[in-house]
């Protein structure tokens, strides 16, 4: 299995678009390093954390997780955290932070120090897909929401969640809303499925 074999499952139009996006990143002189927790010393974390934090600052929020959290996580779970660091020459320009499960890759955080055409798609999606192929992981979950993920190979997958309602007076209203919301989500997922890029079902589904 290879990335080209994966792209071969796309329609010609979608395959051409994905290749064009990857080519634009390469033509900009951008290269990628794959780093796991054990590869990340303080200097590397200090270099890439501002990219993660800036994603929150741009929307008027404080970062959910501080730098010390990531350093501690990498030290305690070195094989479970993976970073794709984009760079031009020796200078980092963007990072995507992933978590590695026994059979799945989970994409969670991203940030960049500038605007580069298609860099988000390459760093967060295409690089992750290549990693899954190389490591023979069965699933890649890049995070919730985002119609832009669909033409890049991710199909909508319905997920469940459980919630505790402390005040029983809210239970009926919440139950009614959840039932109506479920019907809407089913309809939306069916509509999105009409736009997946595959000309045949992929061997392993990538989850949206």
Residue ranges and their predicted role:
Residues 1-118, 164, 179, 196-208:
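A conserved beta-strand-loop-helix scaffold within acyl/acetyltransferase catalytic domains
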Residues 102-168, 175:
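Acyl-donor binding region in acyl/amide transferases
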Residues 168-179, 195:
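C-terminal "cap" of GNAT-fold acetyltransferases
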Residues 178-192:
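Short Fe-S-cluster ligation motifs
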